Each structure stands twice: as C-alpha cells, then as structure tokens.
Amino acid sequence: VATKRGIQYIPAIDGLRAVAVIAVILYHLGISWIPGGFLGVDLFFVISGYVITRLLLDSIQERGGLDLRDFYMARIRRLLPPLIFMIVVTSIVVGIWAPDTTKKFLTDAPFSIFGGMNWWLVFNEQDYFESSGRPPLLQHTWSLAVEAQFYLLWPLILLVVLKYFGKKVIPAAALIIAAISGIALMLVSFQLDATNTS
C-alpha cells in the first residue's frame, strides 16, 4: 500500500470511483439494464466520507489536533476553481445558445458556488428525477453541495466526539449519524411521493 497526499493510499478506492463514474454515466444515458446507476453518487459519498475521516484522524494523531483553517482552505482550493470554471463556460454557452434560460441560470449560480444547491432545489420543490421539461442547468451540483456541507460539519462533529468521548466511539457516532440521516431521507422520500401522487 503506497502513500498518497500524506495518507495511506488504497488503489481499490480508485477502482470504486471508476465503477461509480461508469454507473452514473450509464444511468444518464438511459441504459435500461442499469436503472440503479444513480446510486454511484451514493458510492462517491461513502468514499469521500471514508477518505476525509481518515485524513482528519491521521492529522489529529500526527499533530495532536486539527487545523480547521488549513482543512477548509484545502477543500476550497480543490473544489471551487473547477466549479467556477464550469459555471463561467456554461454561462457563455447559455448566453449564446439558450438566452431564455439566462435568468434562471444566474439565479441558481450563487447557490451552486456557495454549496447550497441541494436546499435551493428542495425550496423550489424541484424533483431531480423529473423527466418532463428542461431541468435547471446547474441542478447536478446538488451532490457537490452535499459534499461541501459534509466538509463543513463533519470535522466539527469529529472534534466534539473526540474531545468528550474519545476515539473509540467514532464508529458508533458515525453509525448513529448515518441512521438519523437515513431516517430523514426516508421521511423526505415519503413526503415527495405523497406530493407527486396527490
């Protein structure tokens, strides 16, 4: 096992990322034999959770603490430049070939940049799986927003857990948080289903 970016590098993780990418691409291409391809996004979330938690725990163990400023700045430098580049290029394309969507695009852009696109879609009752009509051009950045919110909150939660309970309870804390998140997701799904059928 090699070392990459200061943490233990596991080649199989890159393999899982490749599987997730292929699954998502095939899903969006409408391949009928892989209807659950969108779950590749969930796989990305699991991988990110594992990698970031390992990174944070290794940093705490090696330095005796966690520099939140360095962590947040590293995440910003990693995510924001390509996101802004994509938005700028898309805005040019929109202005030339789809000017009728410019207002909606400019309204959505700040929520995409500042990591709130998922909540903006919820607020506007926008169904990601809606097949009719033209979806918002930045709708896909909801997953990036979820990841950004995880980056923001998880280090704080981890520090609190370590301070008051110790390292041994981290797996239990992660399971509890996952269970709560799963219950919340299920409740939201039932609510959306009820709305769609009413």
Each model region followed by its residue ranges:
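Membrane-interface helix/loop caps of multi-pass membrane proteins
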Residues: 1-198
